[in-house]
Regions:
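Basic, Lys/Arg- and aromatic-enriched nucleic-acid-binding interface segment
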Residues: 145-182
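Flexible interdomain linker/hinge and immediately adjacent N-terminus
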Residues: 112-150, 256-260
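Short, basic (Lys/Arg/His-rich) helix/loop patches that form interaction surfaces
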Residues: 157-158, 269-310, 314
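Alpha-helix N-cap/helix-start motif at helix boundaries, enriched for small hydrophobics
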Residues: 171-172, 183-188, 308
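N-terminal core-binding DNA-recognition domain of tyrosine recombinases/integrases
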Residues: 24-131
Length: 333
């Protein structure tokens, strides 16, 4: 059995050193045609490190270490649910377990908890992942047409009245136009919004794990001209609110003047309300449908899965390719 101390005290660093070795390549149990080992590419190593760090972060939150976590714990990790929906689909969950299995194999830990977790989740009996829902171009336009607008003003005019409606409008456009997750949108920070405007009118959003979900992968998400046209007025208003109302915090879309972070539940309700105003089916209304729509449109326009992976901040190219299976659902009758 290998020395386990470093894998418990600094597991991510230990894995970084392991993933670039022949020892890691051997655990894949795959050889080239000439019988030699296939080395892990830098890009693949980066993906593996991200996945391993994500798993270790969760394990640490449970008060466990890599060598004390059980198969039952790992089953809970890949079976997590957020907002009623799986955090990881079954294929991604399996890849996490397989990666951990390779680590335990290298360390000589028996029984192998990740292997036990895989066996406990008989893959043949797992439900098939829902291919997801997307909007047609016509449905998406109706969604944009139904976005929140300023409420009717009464006789009394209050400075910045209705600012939250303009915030909600800008946020929903950014989610739809840049393919962000709701976690990425509510955690978007002012300094992550690019100032440089490209020739096509787009700007870059630099998405980092800071204030996002623990599965957020650092990436650049281009926001096209149409999205910039909605975001810039809101950012200008937000800047004035900082000066005149002492709005706090660094969130692009704060929940209140104290600068608190919006909740995913609140954003879900707002998006669902827009779906309802647009006459769209609300049973699958949410940020995920908007992200699916963005991804499917990118693939339909000729984007390669490896390109889409980078735009969406996904760890695996195969995850990006899966968006081609999303389905467009007819409007309710």
């Amino acid at each position: 059995m290998k020395n386990l101390t470093s894998w418990d005290t600094d597991p991510v660093q230990a894995f970084k050193e392991f993933v670039v070795t022949d020892a890691f390549a051997k655990t894949a149990q795959r050889l080239r045609a000439d019988g030699t080992l296939k080395a892990v590419s830098k890009e693949s190593a980066k993906t593996y490190v991200f996945m391993f760090a994500n798993a270790v972060a969760w394990i640490t939150e449970q008060g466990k270490t890599l060598t004390t976590v059980t198969a039952g714990d790992l089953v809970r990790f890949v079976s997590r649910v957020d907002g009623g929906k799986p955090v990881l689909n079954s294929k991604i969950g399996y890849r996490y377990l397989r990666l951990l299995e390779r680590c335990y194999q290298h360390l000589g830990i028996t029984p192998n908890p990740a292997k036990q977790a895989i066996l406990a989740q008989d893959r043949a009996e797992l439900p098939k992942d829902d291919p997801g829902r997307a909007l047609s171009p016509e449905q998406l336009q109706r969604f944009f047409d139904a976005l929140p607008a300023d409420p009717p003003r009464g006789k009394r005019v209050v400075p910045f009245s209705g600012w939250n409606h303009r915030r909600d409008r800008a946020m929903q456009v950014v989610i739809a136009r840049a393919g962000l997750t709701v976690s990425e949108a509510i955690g978007l920070l002012v300094h992550e919004v690019g100032n440089q405007v490209a020739l096509d009118g787009s700007i870059n959003l630099t998405i980092t794990p800071e204030e996002k979900h623990d599965t957020s992968y650092e990436h650049i998400a281009p926001l096209p001209r149409e999205g910039v046209a909605e975001l810039r007025p809101w950012l200008d208003e937000r800047s004035r609110m900082v000066l005149e109302l002492a709005m706090k915090g660094d969130f692009v879309f704060p929940a209140n003047l104290e600068g608190a972070k919006m909740t995913k539940k609140t954003v879900y309700k707002q998006i669902k309300a827009t779906f309802a105003r647009a006459g769209l089916d609300t049973s699958r209304a949410g940020g995920r449908t908007l992200r699916n729509t963005f991804a499917k449109a990118q693939l339909d326009a000729g984007a390669r899965p490896d390109e889409l992976k980078d735009v969406l901040g996904l760890a695996l190219e195969r995850s990006a390719a899966d968006y081609k299976f999303t389905r467009i659902k007819d409007d309710p009758k």
